[in-house]
Amino acid sequence: MLRTFQRTLTKCQTPSLAIRKQCFRRQFANARSTKYMGRSGSSLRYGPWLTASALIATSLCFYDGTVQNDEKNDGSLPYNESVQVDSSVSDFPLTITALNFPVSTNFKLLGYGQRHVTFLRFKVYALGLYLAVNDEDLIANTFNEAYLHKYFLDVDDSKTFKQNLARFLKRDDPKSVMMIDDLLDSGMRMLAKITPVRNTDFKHLKEGLVKTISKHPDVANNKETLENGLEELNKAFSRNGSVRKNDDLIIELLANGALQFSYHDNKNNEFEVMGLVNNQLVGKFLFSQYLSGDKSPSPQAKKTAIDKLITLM
């Protein structure tokens, strides 16, 4: 088996297979017994030898051809690159893919920042906001010249389209919230990675999400529907216990507006899919708060995400 691994590694060292090599090396490093929660309430354990055998098959598959997925595999994705969001936790990857996280598609980092509790003046968690790679076109499809002139009377014709767009998105008024809500209504998939910078628990994480959602300006107009959605959130987030510093809460906004929650035990490199919230308002209001308004949990993450979003037009 060792010789087989050596032969496979030799094949993967071909320059044209650089991306596949990175994937194989990452998988090889995780060849110890791991736990992956394939669906809520179920778990799978793989012994080292079974995992090693699977890795050989995976490496050969990568050598002979690209892995088939529900989306095209963008070879330009910098799988091994990252950015420091907070010095007390691991760097955030520039991309999150189904190869290393329990997600449905490839995501790339849009913005990042920290969540502070103002009155206590301490940091709570690091936040990364990711956009589905294949959904970039939805930005330009939603925000165009006709859109701006339809909803805004103060379009400055002396400025470029991007300059006007940036001005409207950064104003922190009801119309900037409306713009982000329209973008989310297009079916754009997003992901939030929350990494505590101090030990906490699932209860506090859930309460933080509920508070963020409840601050959306349209809550009063959707009270009954949102109450049902928060009930769903409570059931999907039913896990109790502590969450260590540097663990990850992964929140994926699906194309149909549902939210998928996953937990990453960073110390043991184990993933658990916690649950699904089908109520569309919950996901929409959560990510709308991340990207707009004056009550975003991380103004820094909002600013960097909006700046990046504009460059993608």
Please name every model-derived segment:
Residues M1-P48:
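N-terminal mitochondrial targeting presequence
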Residues Y36-K245, E272-M313:
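Extracellular glycan-recognition regions
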Residues S262-L276:
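Short, compositionally biased
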